[in-house]
Amino acid sequence: MNKVLIFGCGGHAVSCFEVLKCEGHEIAGFVKKSDEAIEKNIIKFNSSPEIQIFSETDDLMKISSKAVIGIGQIKTCEPRKNLFKKLSLDGFDLINVISSQANLSKYTSLGKGVFIFKEAIINANVSIGNNCIINTGSIIEHDCNISNDCHVSVGSIINGNV
């Protein structure tokens, strides 16, 4: 299994790190924008020799071609949307990550770069687009269509046929 790069150095990246590790992924490191502040918890992870912090200007494809977007979506989806487009064009494999503590119907379809956190429940005939966050404890009932670049926030409930 190739190591995974986490693009982002904030709180959401910390949450992504934990799920990736719990699901057995090896982490290549975190990638930060040149002007991005680094979450203090990431500095703690960086004290481990196998976890590094890279700059977006590094030759990242030499490190790994697998990636997740570790920036959240608090105010707008534009930063995630733009990063997804850039990484896709650069040839990165934006992997889907599904916590083993989530409950996902086998009749669910997923786009690329989907991240499903712990205790999420996704029922039958749900379609989830590219670059989506299905956050901790959220529920998506039957026959829902979650478009590209959506964030179903912590504890959200989306009833059927939405």
Protein language model regions, located:
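Hydrophobic, well-ordered beta-alpha structural blocks that scaffold small-molecule cofactor pockets
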Residues: M1-S48, F54-M61
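Short, glycine/serine-rich, charged loops/turns that create anion-binding
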Residues: G11, D35, I74-K75, I121
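Short alpha-helical
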Residues: G11-H12, K75-E78, S109, I128
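Glycine-rich, phosphate-binding/catalytic loops in enzymes
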Residues: E23, F84-L87, C132, C150
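Phosphate-bearing ligand-interacting subdomains
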Residues: E39-S99, N103
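Structural signal for interior beta-strand "rungs" in well-ordered beta-sheet cores
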Residues: N96-V162
